[in-house]
Amino acid sequence: MSVLVKEVIEKLRLDIVYGEPELLEKEINTADITRPGLEMTGYFDYYTPERIQLLGMKEWSYLISMPSNSRYEVLKKMFLPETPAVIVARGLVVPEEMLKAARECKIAILTSRAATSRLSGKLSSYLDSRLAERTSVHGVLMDIYGMGVLIQGDSGIGKSETGLELVKRGHRLVADDRVDIFAKDEITLWGEPAEILKHLIEIRGVGIIDVMSLYGASAVKDSSQVQLAVYLENYDTHKTFDRLGNNAEELEVSGVAIPRIRIPVKTGRNISVVIEAAAMNYRAKEMGFDATRLFDERLTSLIARNEVQNA
């Protein structure tokens, strides 16, 4: 995957100091950013020209302190064909030598009024999410009470119908049928729809529904963190399902594990309400309120009292 320079400009609201249209179509293939330091002294061993070059106050001050001809020579060595763009932070004035080198080497020069550290963080986060490797899973991703819940199950079990019912109950659809999931960092999963399926949901017997057109912009979301997985399966009298919520199960995607619960589907059960309760219960556990632990404590206390009375 790659990101175009013009997409970064639009996302971070950067100003274009120099950049022909074809330069804004350059591809960025790495989320790493370089803040050139030793390179300005002429040391180019281990230089990474394929990264976006970000100049803050320190780099700019050192550059300005150099004689004009030395400044131009250093910048010409820094600006290579594979360099996607150069960004100058804090709204600092771009030296004429930089513009001259950029024109000769065909490198876009961009500026931002944001502080260097803040700009670097936003840029890294954006590139990380855009360039992360995607894993496609079958299911429905919903935003329920601000939590990303991935609904999975066998084909025909009613995942999309459950998603539609949740939309009617005020929750938001992120993706139906195919969910593209990526690891935003070592502990966080993020999910989004395939572009062709965005805001659409397929219901057997009805066809494809445009959720945004029918229910409005508040019924959809472009992406969401994936925090909980729910697996729907047919009710089986010969199978034992978790009744206390103490059998921990996990779903692992891209090396990141999230909790997963299994919900048996049976005629008469309102699955959307059950999933709502599961989402709220998970949030309560994250806040330190565990109903299973509370029940266990009460049961232990009751047994202890009975033993004392019967002694």
Curated annotation (Swiss-Prot):
Biological process (GO), any one: regulation of carbohydrate metabolic process
Keywords: ATP-binding, Carbohydrate metabolism, Kinase, Magnesium, Metal-binding, Multifunctional enzyme, Nucleotide-binding, Serine/threonine-protein kinase, Transferase
Catalytic reaction annotation: [HPr protein]-L-serine + ATP = [HPr protein]-O-phospho-L-serine + ADP + H(+); [HPr protein]-O-phospho-L-serine + phosphate + H(+) = [HPr protein]-L-serine + diphosphate
Active site: H138, K159, D177 (proton acceptor), R243
Ligand binding (ATP): G153, D154, S155, G156, I157, G158, K159, S160
InterPro entries, alphabetized: HPr(Ser)_kin/Pase, Hpr_kin/Pase_C, Hpr_kin/Pase_Hpr_N, P-loop_NTPase, Ser_kin/Pase_Hpr-like_N_sf
Pfam families registered for this protein in UniProt: Hpr_kinase_C (PF07475), Hpr_kinase_N (PF02603)
Region (Important for the catalytic mechanism of dephosphorylation): 264-269
Keyword Lyase part of the UniProt annotation: no
Enzyme class name: transferase
Span list, region Important for the catalytic mechanism of both phosphorylation and dephosphorylation: 201-210
Annotated residues for binding of Mg(2+): S160, E202
Cofactor(s) the protein needs: Mg(2+)
Enzyme Commission number(s): 2.7.11.-, 2.7.4.-
Subunit structure: Homohexamer.
Function: Catalyzes the ATP- as well as the pyrophosphate-dependent phosphorylation of a specific serine residue in HPr, a phosphocarrier protein of the phosphoenolpyruvate-dependent sugar phosphotransferase system (PTS). HprK/P also catalyzes the pyrophosphate-producing, inorganic phosphate-dependent dephosphorylation (phosphorolysis) of seryl-phosphorylated HPr (P-Ser-HPr).
Similarity-based family: Belongs to the HPrK/P family.
Other noteworthy facts: Both phosphorylation and phosphorolysis are carried out by the same active site and suggest a common mechanism for both reactions.
Entry comment, domain topic: The Walker A ATP-binding motif also binds Pi and PPi.
Protein name listed in UniProt: HPr kinase/phosphorylase
Gene name as annotated: hprK
